[in-house]
A protein has these predicted regions:
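Non-catalytic, structured segments within soluble enzyme domains
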Residues: 1-38, 188, 193, 204-208
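Conserved, well-ordered alpha-helix/loop/beta-strand core segments that scaffold catalytic motifs
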Residues: 18-64
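Second-shell loop/turn segments in exported
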Residues: 30-38, 59-62, 100-108, 145-152, ...
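Active-site SXXK
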Residues: 47, 81, 108-133, 162, ...
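A short, well-structured edge-of-sheet supersecondary motif
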Residues: 64-95, 190, 239-240
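Short active-site loop at a secondary-structure junction
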Residues: 66-71, 94-116, 129-135, 204
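Conserved catalytic neighborhood of penicillin-recognizing serine enzymes
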Residues: 127-183, 232, 244
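Active-site-proximal helix/loop microenvironment
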Residues: 193-244
């Protein structure tokens, strides 16, 4: 379930979900199931190597011997909607179970969220690639002064150009016009599970300033939804489970 009428309903659902998840996990370890996955070993190896190589210069570890600087990644086959590779952190030997950051550790998505949260909804609400938007400094309704990170402004620009230059102010203007409630509804329907009430309140959400953030699994599934003509498919690497 992805759609909730209130925060309390969502919290209650999550509690029941966690309880059932724990029960299923116990059964998984004791019932002798055969589990078939969509993981592609070659893609998995490449993704793990990409994460490890990108962070190889960061060697500091915590008291448990785990690297402090981490990353995650998720790769989805757009034809099937299945996860073919998922990396929850840097590869280490003899560590045992660690947090799978790909779906358990939200981080700020930054500008990567703009197409999912603002531009795709804009297209569904009558905008086109040629529609114009003001790319000039502005103040939002919640009193935030918004500027472009690169410090340049172009006045009236097309939606296409706004995406190309990743304009903060153009994105914010569209977000204000559509309203946070309208835009965030799209993330709700794609099961972005770390949304909070504050994310609906502050306009900086649309440029990646979430309270908790998103996961690489959520982001990959979101972009896979764009490729699938707007139809969301829940990301999973499980193909089937048998008892014999």
């Amino acid at each position: 379930k992805y759609d909730f009428s209130s925060t309390s309903e969502k919290k209650k659902y999550q509690e029941e979900y966690d309880k059932m998840y724990a029960e299923c996990k116990r059964t998984l370890y004791s019932a002798g199931y055969h589990i078939y996955t969509s993981i592609d070993p070659d893609v998995q190896k490449q993704l793990q190597s990409s994460v490890d190589n990108a962070l190889s210069g960061y060697t500091e570890k915590d008291k448990n011997g785990i690297y402090k600087t981490q990353a995650s990644g998720t790769c989805i086959d757009n034809d099937t909607g299945k996860v073919v590779a998922i990396v929850g952190g840097r590869e280490q030997k003899n560590i045992g179970y660690t947090l799978n950051r790909a779906f358990q550790s939200p981080r700020q998505p930054g500008s990567a969220i703009k197409p999912l949260l603002v531009y795709a909804p804009a297209l569904e609400h009558g905008w086109s690639a040629g529609s114009t938007v003001n790319d000039s400094p502005m103040s939002t309704k919640d009193k935030h002064r918004v500027r472009n990170s690169h410090g340049s402004y172009s006045g009236q620009i097309s939606l296409r150009r706004a995406v190309q230059k990743s304009s903060n102010v153009a994105t914010m203007r569209i977000y204000e016009q559509l309203t946070p409630k309208t835009c965030l509804k799209y993330l709700e329907e794609m099961n972005f599970k770390y949304l909070t009430d504050s994310d609906y309140k502050y306009y900086t959400t649309c440029i990646g300033g979430f309270t908790k953030g998103t996961t690489s699994e959520e982001m990959a599934a979101g972009y896979a939804t764009l490729k699938n003509d707007g139809v969301y498919r829940e990301p999973t690497c499980i193909s089937k489970i048998t008892t014999s």
